[in-house]
Amino acid sequence: MAVYTDVAADELADFLSGYDLGDLLSYKGIAEGVENSNFLLHTTRGHFFLTLYEKRVAKADLPFFLNLMGHLAARGITCPQPVANRGGETLGTLAGRPAAIIDFLEGVWPRKVSVPHCAAIGEALAKLHLAGADFKMTRANALSVAGWRPLFEAAVARADTVQAGLRDFLATELAHLEANWPQALPRGIIHADLFPDNALFVGDTLSGLIDFYFACNDLLAYDVAICLNAWCFEADHSFNVTKASTFLNAYGKVRPLSEPEQAALPLLARGAALRFLLTRLVDWLNVPPGALVKPKDPLEYVRKLRFHQGVRTIAGYGLARSESVT
C-alpha cells in the first residue's frame, strides 16, 4: 500500500456522505507497497481502508477483484470485503481516481517471518486455489511470461545504472524463460502477490489475506513459486530451506502438487523472481516526484534469481519428490 494521490478533507467528506459509515474522525495515508493510494479511515463505526486505484490497476478489472473477494469469503477464505454505498455500488470516484472502501481486518503483517507463518501461508494458499476453482469470472495475468519483455524493454536502457551487467543478465534469463516456460500445468485463480505485507497475523495465527489486485488466472504452481520467493529468504538474502519445506508440505496437505508441477517448480521460481525484479526495476527508475512511497530494491531479486538458477529439482527447496504428490 502507498500514497500517490492526495485526498483533501472536503473531497473525502463528500465521498463518504454516500456511505453509512458514521462520522469521519481521522484518516491517514499508508506508505507501504507500490501500486495504489491507500488510506486508513477511522469513523464512528470503526476502521476501514480507502483505496484509490492507480497506474497498474485498470478500472475494467475492478469488478473481477471485488467479486473474487466475495467469492472467496463465501468459501471460508478470510479476506477483506468491499463496502457498498447507499446506492449499492462498491466503486466510486475520488480525486479523479476509481475508489473503493474495504472493511478492516484485525492483525498485522509479520516483519520477521517465522516457520509457523510459512505453514499458515502454505495451507491458506492451497485453500485459496481450491476455493477459486468455481469462480466464473476470468482475468489474464498481464505479468506472466508474455508480459516480461515489455517490462524489460521499459528498463533496459538504464538497467546498468542500477548494477553493472544487469542488462545482459536480464536479457539472457528472459530468453531462457520464454523458451522453456511450462504450459500444461493446472491453472486457476491465483493471488499472484502473496507477500508478507499482504497477510495479516495475530501472533502466529493467520487472520486474513489482503490485496487481491494482481489476482488472475494462471498456473497454480506459479503462485507457489511466488511464495517461495516472498516467504523463504532471510534478511541477508540466504534461502531458508526449513521455511520452504514447511510451506510446501503445508500446501501439499491441502492441495498436493503433481509430479509435473514439482518438476517445473525451479523454473517457475526463476520466473517469479524475474517478474518481481523487472517490476521493481521499472518502479525504481520511475518513482513519481513527491510520492509518499518506499521503492523496493530490485537487486534483492537478482540475488534470489541467481539462487533459483542453481536449483535443479524440488529437493533444492527441501521437499522430496515422494512428498505431496497426487
Curated annotation (Swiss-Prot):
Keyword Amino-acid biosynthesis: yes
Domain of life: Bacteria
Family of the protein in this entry: Belongs to the pseudomonas-type ThrB family.
One MF term in the entry's GO annotations: homoserine kinase activity
Catalytic activity entry: L-homoserine + ATP = O-phospho-L-homoserine + ADP + H(+)
Gene3D superfamilies listed in its UniProt record: 3.90.1200.10, Phosphorylase Kinase, domain 1
Annotated metabolic or biological route of this protein: Amino-acid biosynthesis; L-threonine biosynthesis; L-threonine from L-aspartate: step 4/5
Catalytic activity, EC: 2.7.1.39
GO biological process: threonine biosynthetic process
Keyword ATP-binding recorded: yes
Keywords linked to the UniProt accession: Amino-acid biosynthesis, ATP-binding, Kinase, Nucleotide-binding, Threonine biosynthesis, Transferase
Species, as recorded: Afipia carboxidovorans (strain ATCC 49405 / DSM 1227 / KCTC 32145 / OM5) (Oligotropha carboxidovorans)
Record's protein name: Homoserine kinase
Upper lineage: Bacteria, Pseudomonadati, Pseudomonadota, Alphaproteobacteria, Hyphomicrobiales
